[in-house]
């Protein structure tokens, strides 16, 4: 009996030492870095491509990165009470040291594909576009390099995200739960606009990332395979504005009771471009007014959403609590 207890005690002591060693490794060793493999990028110079890049940057990127100086200098994105703590978005102006001025076009493309910055550290995947066409990604980078006022250099600097000092986040990163997105460097093309449903899927899940807000949570979205995101297009995601007021994203699956299954295509177009619901009320301001979208784009998104499995999730019930 004494021998068994002794063996058990030794085993327990070894286990405790292993746990202490693992905790010390998580807490005190450097964060992992990854090899940066910038692809070759040919930036477009035509006005149509710049306009396309402007759409994404000003409709999507600006929501998080537009600072108080009117430039893409970053802003406070989450408060200390947030599960991941206080976090500021990055300065992505053309400043040579405080923005993205040091990045090559290839390094920017690799960052947008994988979430790995030029120093080999993971900073994504919130802003990643792993399935965007090479042509469209180049249009975004071309606009980031343009003479647009919002992209001009800003001196703004921000504190490092609080989550970087979190033991839990460090553990998730070091054990590979949080990791960069894969990228094999193979060419990626967008579907043609003539294939309306495929084109609509591309716009809704990649180019404009509608699913990002309209699925269950930013934290559980799956950028590589958007359809596997929990609550895909069924809403329920608390979306904050610049003053941290939140509204719950709506179910936009074809559910007739809780989604947009009873809407017409024209009503959907009015909601997306003008922010007007079928009953005449206005959408909350967290939902951007996509007035610059072509009708063809909105109709393609509508056609694709009709193919999404209906969900009976009722986000309004969550909001009412």
Please report, for each region that a protein language model flagged, where it lies by residue.
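Electrostatic cytochrome c docking/interface patches
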Residues: 31-57, 174-205
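Extended surface/linker regions that mediate inter-domain or inter-protein docking
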Residues: 13, 17-23, 130-201, 297-304
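Extended amphipathic alpha-helical interaction segments
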Residues: 187-192, 212, 218-222
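Gly/Gly-Pro-rich "capping" loops immediately C-terminal to redox-active cysteine motifs
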Residues: 44, 68-105, 124-133, 159-171, ...
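C-terminal capping alpha-helices of c-type cytochrome domains
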Residues: 104-117, 129-154, 264-280, 288-317
């Amino acid at each position: 009996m004494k021998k068994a207890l002794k063996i058990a005690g030794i085993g327990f002591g070894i286990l405790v030492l292993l746990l202490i060693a693992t905790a010390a490794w998580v807490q005190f060793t450097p964060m992992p870095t990854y090899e940066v493999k910038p692809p070759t990028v040919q930036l477009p110079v035509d006005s149509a491509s710049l306009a396309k890049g402007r759409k994404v940057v000003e409709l999507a990127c600006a929501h998080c990165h537009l600072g108080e100086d009117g430039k893409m200098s970053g802003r406070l994105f989450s408060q200390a009470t947030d599960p991941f703590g206080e976090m500021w978005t990055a300065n992505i102006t053309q400043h040579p040291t405080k923005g993205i001025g040091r990045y090559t076009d290839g390094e920017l493309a690799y960052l947008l594909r994988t979430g790995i910055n030029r120093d080999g550290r993971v900073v994504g995947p919130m802003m990643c576009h792993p399935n965007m066409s090479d042509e469209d990604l180049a249009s975004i980078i071309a606009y980031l390099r343009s003479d647009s006022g919002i992209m001009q250099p800003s001196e703004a600097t921000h504190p490092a995200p609080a989550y970087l000092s979190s033991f839990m986040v460090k553990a998730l990163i070091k054990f590979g739960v949080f990791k960069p997105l894969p990228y094999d460097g193979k060419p990626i093309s967008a579907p043609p606009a003539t294939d309306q449903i495929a084109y609509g899927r591309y716009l809704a899940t990649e180019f404009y990332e509608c699913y990002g807000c309209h699925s269950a949570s930013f934290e559980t979205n799956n950028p590589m395979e958007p359809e596997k995101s929990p609550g895909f297009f069924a809403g329920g995601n608390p979306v904050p504005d610049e003053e941290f007021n939140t509204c719950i994203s709506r179910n936009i699956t074809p559910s007739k009771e809780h989604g947009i299954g009873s809407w017409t295509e024209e009503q959907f177009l009015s909601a997306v471009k003008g922010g007007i619901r079928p009953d005449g009320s206005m959408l909350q301001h967290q939902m951007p007014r996509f007035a610059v979208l072509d009708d063809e784009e909105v109709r393609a998104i509508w056609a694709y959403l009709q193919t999404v499995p209906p969900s009976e999730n009722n986000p309004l019930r969550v909001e009412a609590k």
